[in-house]
Amino acid sequence: MLPASPKMEHKAVVFLLLLFLKSGLGDLLDDYVNTQGASLLSLSRKNLAGRSVEDCAAKCEEETDFVCRAFQYHSKEQQCVVMAENSKNTPVFRMRDVILYEKRIYLLECKTGNGQTYRGTTAETKSGVTCQKWSATSPHVPKFSPEKFPLAGLEENYCRNPDNDENGPWCYTTDPDKRYDYCDIPECEDKCMHCSGENYEGKIAKTMSGRDCQAWDSQSPHAHGYIPSKFPNKNLKMNYCRNPDGEPRPWCFTTDPQKRWEFCDIPRCTTPPPSSGPKYQCLKGTGKNYGGTVAVTESGHTCQRWSEQTPHKHNRTPENFPCKNLEENYCRNPNGEKAPWCYTTNSEVRWEYCTIPSCESSPLSTERMDVPVPPEQTPVPQDCYHGNGQSYRGTSSTTITGRKCQSWSSMTPHRHLKTPENYPNAGLTMNYCRNPDADKSPWCYTTDPRVRWEFCNLKKCSETPEQVPAAPQAPGVENPPEADCMIGTGKSYRGKKATTVAGVPCQEWAAQEPHQHSIFTPETNPQSGLERNYCRNPDGDVNGPWCYTMNPRKPFDYCDVPQCESSFDCGKPKVEPKKCSGRIVGGCVSKPHSWPWQVSLRRSSRHFCGGTLISPKWVLTAAHCLDNILALSFYKVILGAHNEKVREQSVQEIPVSRLFREPSQADIALLKLSRPAIITKEVIPACLPPPNYMVAARTECYITGWGETQGTFGEGLLKEAHLPVIENKVCNRNEYLDGRVKPTELCAGHLIGGTDSCQGDSGGPLVCFEKDKYILQGVTSWGLGCARPNKPGVYVRVSPYVPWIEETMRRN
């Protein structure tokens, strides 16, 4: 029997204060999770006028007809939609020009403190009994009801704590013999951590030794690759302790120049951790939830027990990772690898992947057996799209703002219905840009939780003659008013296109029919060229020029304005690279001239190192390539080559006139050419990064070269390989490069091995795609062998040396 409590007798009740209400509107928005391009199909909603996001947030807080859990803001229509539902219980759809704001408190399935503010959807007690609805009177007549306590969140039969009970959320039960019972709600990770603290969101900002944490958005005193904007789902706020890389517990970079990083002392939560989902005896996805008993690697090695340190020492122990199911010596995937793996009992082989039967072919799996799986379609190289891009089957997987596309078969971070099963003829392969619903151009869901979808960074195939400026334009110079093409997002477009992509005439900017508006008028935006009904981009929309339409049911739409063809811009190849995902040992042969900045350094006509064209007269390479240099007359630079063993028509051969080594002995050097290279579609410079720019960890980059292939394939042909950047903190672990990597160097590679630069690739480029161009971020420098497991390649960071590079070129 439970003791007597306020739940059984009348007692004065402390009225609940909604803790998420703040005094300032700016603070109020901190209590919302926002997602661009997302819309809810809510049944309880109101459409209201709203001039700003803050205005809409205030209207949501003031709503009295229902509990407002979310709102949508439509900037071009100046409209708020306040709603009773959120994404937990209502389908989410993609929509243009909308940002969905959801109250964080209604998305959480955990409690803070005693759970007085808990608004989750758990509806059963600790003992597994279903909760009675708060509005019901059977089997128990409640003392706490929605009518008496309208601010207590007494919805449906969800667990709540309307009387501030110190034991946490509870509910009346559907068992006639048990009036009420407590619910098993996990603690939110703001004061404590579950598992290894991957989801810790607290504000502890000191390390175990008492050092202050360095802010995540700072690069001083320690430069690093955990840039908050590149890790939107890791909550890298302020200088709070976090765990973005799968360590045993949260940590931070420190403000002590002598101590790069250190663990933080975060207490463990006393409640059970949230469920990680069902365990499978077969391989589903990457095997994150594999719970089978396979204990042999793919090459036949027996697995080492996770709790043991011989023959291989490691920190991936059951004690450090209590929620990763590291039992016995069974294959597991505790760190997000491509498949389950284990340390081996062979002292010469540290770890290997395991061969696990797939759930798709396993009799143990009955999930979705009735759904036909479309055949895998082979993507074809395509540099542009025709029409609205429904037929596009290329391999581009980057959005117009540079975000990476989410796989069409994945539901993380965005759940959706545009799957290969639902759209079998739409070519929804991998995470490639597609147009399954006949939008204006190819698009994709993004891997950024804050941005549901975006159009892709693809140009439309055009029959229009190229418009090449007579001379390069200075930064900031706009395209001529008469040009009916746009540069960038078209904010400076002043052409006369006046119909939408669907062919609907545009409404005049000064008119208020059929659509009323007040923000984008000639009076409010006198510098935006809002003349007549011409397509314009007054708000800098990343999707380009738009207009209000003459269709009363369609407030606005985008216009089909082509990009102006410019002269050869740095980092923009005229041939779309293959970007093979293969693992230049083990890479793939590149498409000819798709990496037009690649240079072959020749000594007596023989290739010995790579290099990168960074301007018509300058090449960047590795200093160690020039250690035993003879007279400069022996050296030539070869540009525009694909097959280094054949003299191709596109090749330019230029002697080297001067050599400049970096003065602090970094492995980087500049070569001045005796004459400028002729910029063609086969010869284009790569872009330099901003000074001291840090490449984010896990950024996908590419290396190219003619180096040693160790008998793989493609001898003599330029090869490419895709490599993720590895944070120096990880790369310098004992099992990898053991502290050898300097702050002015970066690591990139697949830790399993199989892909790497090798002899002859030294000095060549490591380029990373940023928004719409390739940036030279690294110069191939050194490695411990070629493509060895656990030994990624090391590259000189280019950004710290940009001031020296620019000054050297300016003076010479």
Swiss-Prot record:
Glycans are attached at N315, S365. Kringle domains mediate interaction with CSPG4. Interacts with CSPG4 and AMOT. Interacts (via the Kringle domains) with HRG; the interaction tethers PLG to the cell surface and enhances its activation. Interacts (via Kringle 4 domain) with ADA; the interaction stimulates PLG activation when in complex with DPP4. Angiostatin: Interacts with ATP5F1A; the interaction inhibits most of the angiogenic effects of angiostatin. The active site is at H624, D667, S762. Residues 29-105 form the PAN domain. Residues 584-810 form the Peptidase S1 domain. GO terms for molecular function: endopeptidase activity; protein domain specific binding; serine-type endopeptidase activity; signaling receptor binding. One of its GO terms (cellular component) is extracellular space. Plasmin dissolves the fibrin of blood clots and acts as a proteolytic factor in a variety of other processes including embryonic development, tissue remodeling, tumor invasion, and inflammation. In ovulation, weakens the walls of the Graafian follicle. It activates the urokinase-type plasminogen activator, collagenases and several complement zymogens, such as C1, C4 and C5. Cleavage of fibronectin and laminin leads to cell detachment and apoptosis. Also cleaves fibrin, thrombospondin and von Willebrand factor. Its role in tissue remodeling and tumor invasion may be modulated by CSPG4. N-linked glycan contains N-acetyllactosamine and sialic acid. O-linked glycans consist of Gal-GalNAc disaccharide which is modified with up to 2 sialic acid residues (microheterogeneity). It comes from Bos taurus. Its EC number is 3.4.21.7. This is Plasminogen. The lineage of its organism: Eukaryota, Metazoa, Chordata, Craniata, Vertebrata. Disulfide bonds join C56-C80, C60-C68, C110-C188, C131-C171, C159-C183, C192-C269, C195-C323, C213-C252, C241-C264, C282-C359, C303-C342, C331-C354, C384-C461, C405-C444, C433-C456, C485-C564, C506-C547, C535-C559, C570-C687, C580-C588, C609-C625, C701-C768, C731-C747, C758-C786. The modification Phosphoserine is found at S600. Plasmin is inactivated by alpha-2-antiplasmin immediately after dissociation from the clot.
